[in-house]
């Protein structure tokens, strides 16, 4: 098959809402519904093919489906999510590959956010307003004044943020994003608003590790040309309306329908697609075409 529709694993983190269900058609009984892992081979939340096979099992038996550009990675390289932040996420940071492999036995996390919708006045935290010392960073975590030196950025639908590992960040309330990231689930929380988890205990913080890995400077500006984001792990583009492309021998293609509806054609197959759906086109499948009044996030390695 040249077109593989994926069903996500979902997460009920306490800051989630209901929009992934009501607005994006994600089928889940979880409440709240915080995340849908729409392209995932991660054991913490795999995506599934229509026959119930995990995407991880599929690529294990069809390694050629990944493409030659994936050969440099020891595992499936990326993970894509829908995220509905009904409340603020924790202020957090992700480690580099070197630090994460040494301390967590998995890869670090560089990621990008594409804002799908947000309430008026929405903002997020993205790095620092100015460079601070490690000592000041630790002290501000301790006395709950960290947000005074964080870079609060107003957001609007269609905005994109590239977040290299080591960047302190958080999505704040009222924002829905599509996130493309390295295939990792390592997060170090530095502040969580005093919230407690389902067990009634405060959620764990990881301050010492965060002090080790955080880049304590303003975020760098990135110019990706015509792409939303591009790095050694992924290249992401946003398409509106009809377009075509190709899944060549170098990489699989991930198509995430972020709005509207249409059709997807590849390898003699044609399927109807709509908002909230995720499709995997194996490497080497050749030309594909999307038609209709839809918006699509296209990711390759």
Language-model segment annotations:
Residues 141-149, 160-162, 168-218:
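An exposed, glycine/acidic-rich loop-and-rim segment of catalytic or binding clefts
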Residues 202-252:
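Functionally critical, mid-to-C-terminal surface segments that flank or help form catalytic/ligand
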Residues 131-143, 249-263:
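Short, basic/aromatic beta-hairpin or loop at an interaction surface
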Residues 1-132, 187, 192-217, 236, ...:
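Transition-metal
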Residues 239, 260, 276, 296:
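Hydrophobic, well-ordered secondary-structure elements that form the walls
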Residues 244, 260-265, 278:
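Short beta-strand segments in beta-sandwich/barrel cores
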Residues 150-162, 267-285:
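Short acidic-glycine-tyrosine-enriched beta hairpin
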Residues 75, 83-88, 97, 107, ...:
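Ligand-binding loop in jelly-roll beta-barrel domains
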């Amino acid at each position: 098959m040249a077109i593989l529709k994926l069903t996500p694993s979902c997460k009920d983190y306490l800051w989630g809402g209901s929009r992934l269900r009501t607005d994006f058609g994600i089928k889940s009984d979880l409440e709240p519904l915080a995340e849908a892992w729409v392209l995932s081979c991660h054991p913490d939340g795999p995506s599934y093919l229509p026959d119930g096979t995990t995407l991880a099992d599929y690529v294990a038996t069809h390694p050629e489906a990944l493409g030659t550009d994936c050969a440099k990675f020891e595992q499936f390289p990326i993970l894509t999510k829908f995220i509905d932040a009904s409340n603020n996420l924790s202020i957090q940071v992700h480690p580099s590959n070197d630090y994460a492999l040494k301390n967590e036995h998995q890869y670090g996390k560089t990621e990008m956010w594409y804002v799908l919708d947000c309430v008026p006045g929405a903002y997020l935290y993205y790095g620092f307003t100015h460079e601070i010392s490690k000592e000041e960073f630790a002290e501000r975590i301790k006395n709950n004044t960290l947000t005074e030196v964080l870079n609060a950025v107003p957001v609007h639908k269609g905005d994109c943020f590239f977040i290299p590992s080591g960047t302190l960040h958080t999505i704040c309330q009222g924002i829905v994003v599509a996130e493309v990231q390295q295939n990792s689930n390592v997060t170090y929380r530095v502040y969580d608003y005093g919230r407690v988890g389902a067990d009634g205990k405060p959620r764990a913080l990881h301050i010492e590790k965060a002090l080790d890995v955080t880049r304590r400077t303003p975020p760098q500006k990135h110019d990706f040309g015509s792409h939303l984001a591009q790095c050694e792990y992924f290249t992401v583009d946003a398409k509106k309306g009809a377009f075509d492309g190709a899944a060549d021998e170098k990489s699989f293609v991930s198509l995430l329908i972020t709005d509207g509806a249409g059709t997807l054609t590849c390898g003699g197959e044609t399927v109807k697609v709509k908002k909230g759906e995720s499709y995997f086109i194996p490497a080497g499948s050749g030309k594909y075409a999307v038609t209709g009044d839809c918006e699509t996030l296209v990711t390759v390695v």
